Structure formats: C-alpha cells, structure tokens
Amino acid sequence: MDNDEIFSKVRSIISEQLDKKEDEITTDSRFVEDLNADSLDIYELLYLLEEAFDDKIPENEANEFETVGDVVNFIKKRKG
C-alpha cells in the first residue's frame, strides 16, 4: 500500500466522520486547528482507522498525531 492509497483511505474516513469535503483535507491539515476535531472526534477517528487498517495505534503514538500526514506516515511505517 503506497502513500496515495493510504491517504485516500484516511481522507475518506476523516471526511465521513468530521463531515468535511474530501478536497478540504490535505496531508497538512491539522486535526484540531483546520478540521475542528475535538477529543471525542479524534478518539472515534482512531478507532475507525484501527478498524480500516486492521492495526492497533498505541496511545503514545496517537498523541503525536497533529496532521493527517502524521497518520499517513505512521500507517505507512507499520504496513511497510
């Protein structure tokens, strides 16, 4: 799975969960500042991402996610 495929899947999940248009979401989009996600939104997003990519996201790693690109890079590393 390459970065574009991962980003597309992540963007789709974020778009649906946060009710944002996909073209508003970039790898530089910040969850809180740009996408207006609150802590519950982020928790739900993490759950959906874990389900979609069949992988557990450790809490210490999740706390480091500021942008959509951070999530894409994390998943890319895990999926090799």
Swiss-Prot record:
Q: What does this protein do?
A: Carrier of the growing fatty acid chain in fatty acid biosynthesis.
Q: Which UniProt keywords apply?
A: Cytoplasm, Fatty acid biosynthesis, Fatty acid metabolism, Lipid biosynthesis, Lipid metabolism, Phosphopantetheine, Phosphoprotein
The GO molecular function terms of this record are: acyl binding; acyl carrier activity
* Gene3D superfamilies in the record: ACP-like (1.10.1200.10)
- PTM annotation: 4'-phosphopantetheine is transferred from CoA to a specific serine of apo-ACP by AcpS. This modification is essential for activity because fatty acids are bound in thioester linkage to the sulfhydryl of the prosthetic group.
User: Which biological process, per GO, is one annotated for this protein?
Assistant: lipid A biosynthetic process
- Provide the protein name: Acyl carrier protein
Which Gene Ontology cellular-component terms appear in the entry?
Answer: cytosol; membrane
Q: Which residues carry this modification: O-(pantetheine 4'-phosphoryl)serine?
A: 39
Domain named Carrier: residues:
4-79
Q: Which family does it belong to?
A: Belongs to the acyl carrier protein (ACP) family.
For this protein, the record's PROSITE patterns field holds: CARRIER
Record InterPro entries: ACP, ACP-like_sf, PP-bd_ACP
Which cell locations does it reside in? Cytoplasm
Pathway per the UniProt entry: Lipid metabolism; fatty acid biosynthesis
